[in-house]
């Protein structure tokens, strides 16, 4: 009997997510045994720098992908929002599970919404995408970088005297911490990260047995939407750690998709929408990316990347 070795980050949230996938597989394939292999990624090891300052793409996935390619594990579980646009040729995303709530949320001391926070409030965030959109909506708010797992970031409201922090709704829901949420940042105003709320299952291209198993747990609607978002991301050559977001939603036989690129300070925000036949999901993602490029998205992202390179040079 085959034991399926599943690679996961070691955080509480990552392990909960791995168990979600294992339970889905067990229901369909009870004849196998399943084992979680904990893997520490570069993003987990370096906690004294913001993600955009570490540089590179795939900070939370590369080591897991390496273990998969080297056949130390059979299956890699990722938060889709951590996945760079490019994946290694020998690996394939065999399944994307049904999306959890894709929204970002605000957790504040006094249960206030973003609009209700006082002038000059200090918010903690781990991403430039969130920082840029907060500053675009509330230029008077100060956004400070915070790192660590969900519990650590929640704790920083007290330990670092923050007025609040921004996290993903999906992670809090999966950890049973929904009651912590003060307010939801609605998608119309606050574009999520590419793939936010969805889990991805990656296997070796040559492992036909594993890929057939993954097909049984794939959520086709979420798969199409997220792959459209990833086509957008790939065209813009954006990593997970630049101010870029996209969200696709199937409505009937149509895909409705929003894409956003912003400067780090939120002073420039380009946001566009596209809709079309869901069967053309990849092409729609590319079309949306091309529209943003025509409006100056590449120049904005290059400025962000240049700023990060300067900071990295000064810090070395």
Curated annotation (Swiss-Prot):
Free-text comment on the cofactor: Binds 1 dipyrromethane group covalently.
Modified residues (S-(dipyrrolylmethanemethyl)cysteine): 240
Primary enzyme class: transferase
Pathway(s) annotated for this protein in UniProt: Porphyrin-containing compound metabolism; protoporphyrin-IX biosynthesis; coproporphyrinogen-III from 5-aminolevulinate: step 2/4
NCBIfam families registered for this protein in UniProt: hemC
The protein's name in its UniProt record: Porphobilinogen deaminase
Family: Belongs to the HMBS family.
PROSITE patterns per the UniProt record, alphabetical: PORPHOBILINOGEN_DEAM
Residues annotated as signal peptide: none
Top-level taxon of origin: Bacteria
GO CC annotation terms, alphabetical: cytoplasm
PANTHER family the record matches: PORPHOBILINOGEN DEAMINASE
Role of this protein: Tetrapolymerization of the monopyrrole PBG into the hydroxymethylbilane pre-uroporphyrinogen in several discrete steps.
A biological process term (GO) from this entry: protoporphyrinogen IX biosynthetic process
Cofactors demanded by this protein: dipyrromethane
Native source organism of the sequence: Alkaliphilus metalliredigens (strain QYMF)
EC number assigned by the record: 2.5.1.61
Reactions the enzyme catalyzes: 4 porphobilinogen + H2O = hydroxymethylbilane + 4 NH4(+)
Assembly information from the UniProt record: Monomer.
A Pfam family matched in the record: Porphobil_deamC
UniProt keyword terms in alphabetical order: Porphyrin biosynthesis, Transferase
GO molecular function: hydroxymethylbilane synthase activity
Further information: The porphobilinogen subunits are added to the dipyrromethane group.
Record gene name: hemC
Presence of the UniProt keyword Transferase in the record: yes
